[in-house]
């Protein structure tokens, strides 16, 4: 079943279409091709030199090493592809923010042009009003002159001339009134259009400003959520993600190696304590199943329980077996290095939050109480200094 699952993962990776493969950078392509070649060569090696029938007769830790050698590059490739997509999404958001800022500049230019247009309209309206005032002044002057001319005519009794002159003045006043009304209506329409255009431009600028703030905030959140290790000022998001990937690869390899070492120590200890190799094999198989189900600390917890509950038997096993001493020394030294690496991170970094004070810390503490840094057992009541901080 495990081999079938691995083959399914390989086929899934090979099933990428050409468009998706073309979007990957050179490093991601090389990692993907390398992982596929690694998986194929591993399967060919198992088929030719080991045989599928002999695969399930291996010891649990040997079977685990075979699975790990096949699945590890595939898992690293999936991680690299995910990080590449994150970098692309961050770059896309940055380009959108840059484009939006350029659009804001063009909108400001449009507003300036519209303001100049409004200024020209106001000047034209002022000129028309001034001309209308001049025409009204001339009308008043003509009216006064007409009255001055009408006075002698009225005294001489010429009613017909007075009637014609009054009709002429009335028609002129009606024409002027109609012109003033049309001018007032046109001015009101221009003011309304100006107000509507101004409100529309203001609303558009506000919406663009809000959109720019939302995109900037989302970009900041993505950058902060992907920041793992403390980096010097001036690093862009892609460099921060590269640091996170490097740290994750180092810690992942170290923890996988520690899990295999803990499995070997457990196997030697249980065989020496109980003498039941079949029972030990079933127990290790159960732990391996739990490990592949997602419990990556199951070997650490089991070894902690043995170090706490059967410390004397574990020390005797290490005293009698050189390989057990070397494996315990390896666990202590690697755990110390991992703890130092995690302690160098910022207290708010994701790596430190995940790994600090975990099962590996408990395993280091339990073993340091009964063993020196070189794996030698301590038989005194007071545990000596093992070189740990």
Swiss-Prot record:
High-level lineage: Bacteria, Pseudomonadati, Pseudomonadota, Alphaproteobacteria, Rhodospirillales
Job description of the protein: Causes tubulation when added to magnetosome-derived liposomes, binds liposomes; may be involved in constriction of the cell inner membrane to form mature magnetosomes. Binds preferentially to cardiolipin, a component of bacterial membranes, with very poor to no binding of other tested (phospho)lipids. Addition of cardiolipin to magnetosome-derived lipids increases tubulation. May function with MamX, MamZ amd Mms6.
Additional observations: This bacteria makes up to 20 cubo-octahedral magnetosomes of about 45 nm in diameter which contain membrane-bound crystals of magnetite (Fe(3)O(4)).
Cellular localization per UniProt: Magnetosome membrane
Topology, Lumenal side: 53-62
Membrane-related topology note: Multi-pass membrane protein
Cellular component, GO annotation: magnetosome membrane
Protein name, as recorded: Liposome tubulation protein MamY
Transmembrane segments: 32-52, 63-83
Main localisation: membrane
Chain segments annotated as coiled-coil in the UniProt record: none
Molecular-function GO term, any one: lipid binding
Entry similarity comment: Belongs to the magnetosome MamY family.
UniProt entry keywords in alphabetical sequence: Biomineralization, Lipid-binding, Magnetosome, Membrane, Transmembrane, Transmembrane helix
Cleavable signal peptide: none
Membrane topology, Cytoplasmic segments: 1-31, 84-389
Disruption phenotype: No growth phenotype, retains a magnetic response. Magnetosome vesicles are slightly bigger than wild-type while magnetite crystals are equal in number but have a much wider size range.
């Amino acid at each position: 079943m495990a081999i079938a699952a691995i083959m399914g993962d390989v086929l899934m990776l090979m099933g990428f279409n050409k468009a998706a493969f073309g979007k990957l950078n050179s490093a991601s392509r090389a990692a993907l091709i390398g992982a596929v070649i690694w998986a194929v060569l591993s399967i060919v090696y198992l088929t030719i030199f080991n045989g599928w029938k002999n695969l399930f007769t291996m010891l649990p830790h040997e079977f685990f090493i075979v699975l790990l050698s096949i699945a590890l590059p595939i898992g690293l490739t999936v991680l690299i592809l995910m990080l590449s997509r994150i970098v692309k999404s961050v770059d896309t958001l940055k380009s959108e923010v840059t484009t939006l800022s350029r659009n804001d500049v063009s909108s400001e230019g449009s507003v300036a042009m519209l303001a100049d247009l409004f200024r020209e309209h106001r000047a034209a309206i002022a000129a028309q009003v001034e001309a209308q005032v001049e025409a009204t002044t001339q009308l008043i002057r003509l009216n006064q002159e007409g009255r001055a001319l009408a006075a002698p005519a009225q005294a001489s009794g010429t009613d017909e001339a007075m009637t014609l002159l009054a009709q002429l003045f009335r028609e002129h006043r009606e024409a002027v009134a109609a012109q003033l009304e049309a001018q007032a209506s046109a001015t009101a329409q221009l003011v309304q259009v100006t107000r509507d255009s101004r409100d529309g431009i203001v609303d558009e600028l506000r919406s663009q400003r809000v959109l720019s703030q939302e995109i900037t905030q989302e970009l900041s959140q993505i950058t902060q959520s992907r920041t793992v290790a403390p980096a010097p000022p001036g690093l862009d998001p892609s460099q921060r993600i590269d640091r996170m990937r490097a740290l994750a690869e180092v810690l992942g390899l170290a923890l996988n190696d520690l899990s295999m070492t803990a499995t070997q120590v457990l196997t030697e200890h249980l065989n020496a304590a109980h003498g039941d190799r079949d029972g030990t094999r079933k127990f290790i198989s159960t732990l391996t199943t739990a490990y592949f189900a997602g419990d990556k600390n199951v070997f650490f917890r089991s070894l902690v329980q043995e170090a706490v509950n059967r410390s004397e038997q574990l020390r005797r096993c290490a005293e009698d077996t050189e390989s057990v001493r070397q494996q315990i020394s390896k666990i202590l030294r690697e755990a110390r290095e991992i703890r130092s690496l995690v302690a160098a991170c910022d207290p708010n970094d994701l790596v430190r939050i995940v790994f600090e004070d975990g099962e590996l810390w408990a395993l280091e503490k339990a073993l340091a109480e009964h063993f020196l840094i070189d794996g030698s057992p301590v038989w005194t009541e007071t545990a000596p200094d093992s070189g740990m901080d």
